[in-house]
Amino acid sequence: MCTKGNRSFEEMALSARKRLEEKSPAEIAEKSGSEYDPKNGRLKTKSLAEQVSLVLPEYSFVQEVEEWHQLVILHYLDLADHTPVSEEQITFGELKDGLIRGTKFDHDMESELAVFLKGKSEEQLYQIIKACGGEIIDSKADICAKFDFLPYYPLWLKIWLADDEFEASGKLLLSKSADHYLAVEDAVTVGGILMEKLRAVSDV
């Protein structure tokens, strides 16, 4: 049975693949921080520390990747322009066209993180972050993890642990250069995918 979600994915993926087929694979690789293997007709990239390979020219995925994760990768490869990655962090609401959808996502994510963090120890959180490909970095937050969702598309998860006065809380942030690589619709999808992975690891 073809659901509305499946149809939407298929239509958007087809459009993205057509755009990519019209471009030079070598140029796509350079602009996106990926690797082009002309001998084997493959484009290789990394998402959350995992290797992802696409068969050219149809840009089909070798590994099993969830549909909307596939679409984000295709859109990233299409939009990437090799803009240097900024270390300046912004909220989803600060993205171009992010005032409504991005701001709503920021609020929803803070609520989801509050539920996710409840009852988890600092050590548990470190283990979950590591299992999802995150890197612990210095920050004013109690815990700050950087996730390279794609080569030039980092996210930062900042966590403040619970104390006598406050419950644990968190924020998910993007790079100021994020608009050069994905539109806000895909950005919120990326945030959702990362949250799902964090939950999945914590449930194991």
Which role fits each region the language model picked out?
Residues 28-56, 135-161:
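Amphipathic, interaction-prone secondary-structure segments
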Residues 50-75, 160-185:
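Intrinsically disordered, low-complexity regulatory segments enriched in Ser/Thr/Pro
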Residues 63, 111, 115-118, 143, ...:
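Short, charged/polar micro-motifs that form catalytic or ligand-binding hotspots
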Residues 74-81, 194, 198:
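Generic structural signal for hydrophobic core residues of well-folded globular domains
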